[in-house]
């Protein structure tokens, strides 16, 4: 936000509490290993016309070079088995279904809901840019779909899709990326 406002000629003051600037984007080293604080990977950067890609290109003045993630971009490890998350989306769906063939329809339902959340999220944030009469007229319409997801926990929502606790565990295995465990996190952040 600060970068975009600055590019528009606005005066901006950014206050950083941490000793190293960068917020969610900085790294640190411990015992010879380098760790990133928050951004591990960002999907969709290979699509140059995507909103996210255009936003990052604008903020960085096209100075970021994006690397494609490995085919296996994440691995969820349980004591008895590991589950790979594979790109692209179609391969991810195939892989999850291969682990849980009896859950095929529930997995399709999950993917459909996640896709809906993504669409609803853009409408929700667009509504925040409206003011006055426009906010009054369009605000409720633009936010209603998002709020039906955001006001429930990830665990509650997934439990309505499936009763398979292992599948829920795998699908929520990345909960550290959004900071709260599934029984506390908003499903909209999942």
Predicted regions and their residues:
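N-terminal glycine-rich phosphate/pyrophosphate-binding loop and immediately adjacent elements
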Residues: 1-119
């Amino acid at each position: 936000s600060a970068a975009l406002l600055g590019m528009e000629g606005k005066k901006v003051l950014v206050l950083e509490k941490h000793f190293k600037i960068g917020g969610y984007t900085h790294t640190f080293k411990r015992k010879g290993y380098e760790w990133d604080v928050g951004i591990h990977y960002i999907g969709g950067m290979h699509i140059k016309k995507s909103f996210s890609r255009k936003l990052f290109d604008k903020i960085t003045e096209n100075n970021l070079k994006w690397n494609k993630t490995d085919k296996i971009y994440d691995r969820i490890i349980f004591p008895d088995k590991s589950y790979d998350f594979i790109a692209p989306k179609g391969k991810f769906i195939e892989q999850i279904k291969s682990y849980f063939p009896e859950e095929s329809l529930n997995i399709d339902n999950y993917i459909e809901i996640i896709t809906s959340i993504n669409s609803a999220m853009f409408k929700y944030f667009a509504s925040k840019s409206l003011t006055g009469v426009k906010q009054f007229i369009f605000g409720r319409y633009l936010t209603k779909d998002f709020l039906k997801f955001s006001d429930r926990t990830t665990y509650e929502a997934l439990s309505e899709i499936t009763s398979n606790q292992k599948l829920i565990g795998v699908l929520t295995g990345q909960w550290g990326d959004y900071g709260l465990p599934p029984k506390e996190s908003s499903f909209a952040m999942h």
